[in-house]
Regions:
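Active-site-adjacent loops and short helices of periplasmic peptidoglycan-processing enzymes
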Residues: 1-68, 72-81
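Domain-terminus/edge residues, biased toward the C-terminal soluble/receptor-binding domains
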Residues: 47-51, 59-261
């Protein structure tokens, strides 16, 4: 009997195709059903150039993807902290020490800040590597497809070096105008305070680190106002490139004025 943890070890560290099939059947009831869910999930992640036909990565004329799509998948995988120990393990064992697992991705033991993800090889796709690393609060992901056995590591290392040397994380700062309360009509208070629903660091070029916030707000809102109500949005730009957008929400309620008051 193998646990889910053992199966994940086998797949992530040892590239075990049989374990991938077992996990697929356990999650979806059958491999075909799992493949359908894989494709639906891939589409949700924005992997619009990807079609999966099996969970193992076997060569198939109908199966295809791109380096950009795989980078999107890795970006999502990086959010699952429970997977990090598997991605970061170079060598492990199953069934006591009966089965040895050795990670084909040598970055798992050699690259500073390594967080994942996968080294693989098939006849049609060649030697591939999807790698991610975090340094100084910034995560970079690089993907090389159809490379050679050794050159894929050199290429990915060069891509990551470029990412860490040319970009940095910047925290958005808001002007006094942003913090100015919004007018409320018909309420017990004449204004309401608001904030951005989701504010986090953004990656910008070190050479051009300018970051601007563009607000979309009405001139006023009508009472009553609930706490957490969406009243607009703010978009963060680096030059002409929008990095991300989030809602503006109220931080307090405002009751409507009544005749009794």
């Amino acid at each position: 009997t193998m646990t889910v943890s053992d199966l994940l070890k086998a797949v992530i560290i040892g590239n075990a195709n049989d374990a991938a099939a077992v996990l697929a059947e356990g999650v979806s009831g059958s491999v075909p059903a799992f493949v359908m869910e894989m494709n639906a999930r891939a589409f949700d992640l924005g992997m619009h150039q990807t079609i999966f036909t099996n969970p193992q990565g076997y060569d198939d004329e109908k199966q295809c993807t791109t380096a950009r799509d795989l980078a999107k998948l890795c970006q999502r995988l990086a959010k699952y902290e429970t997977l990090q120990p598997y991605f970061q393990t170079w060598r492990d064992f199953l069934r006591g020490e009966a089965t040895e697992l050795v990670n084909e991705n040598t970055f798992s033991r050699t690259y500073e800040g390594h967080i994942g993800f996968k080294a693989s090889h098939t006849e049609q796709s060649g030697w591939c590597l999807a790698e991610g690393a975090t340094r100084n609060g910034m995560t970079c992901i690089a993907v090389v497809l159809n490379g050679t056995e050794d050159q894929r590591f050199a290429d990915v290392k060069q891509l990551l070096k470029a990412g860490f040397s040319q970009y940095r994380v910047m925290q958005p700062l808001f002007s006094d105008e942003f913090l100015k309360p919004l007018t409320v009509k018909g309420g017990v208070s004449t204004a309401v305070r608001f904030t951005a629903d989701d504010v986090h660091g953004v990656v910008v070029p070190k050479a051009e680190p300018d970051l601007t916030a563009v607000l979309q707000l009405p001139s006023y809102i009508e009472a009553p106002v609930q706490k957490g109500r969406k009243i607009g949005s703010v978009a963060f730009y680096n030059g002409d490139t929008m990095l991300y957008e989030t809602a503006l929400v109220t931080t307090e309620p405002v009751e409507a004025m009544t005749f009794s008051r």
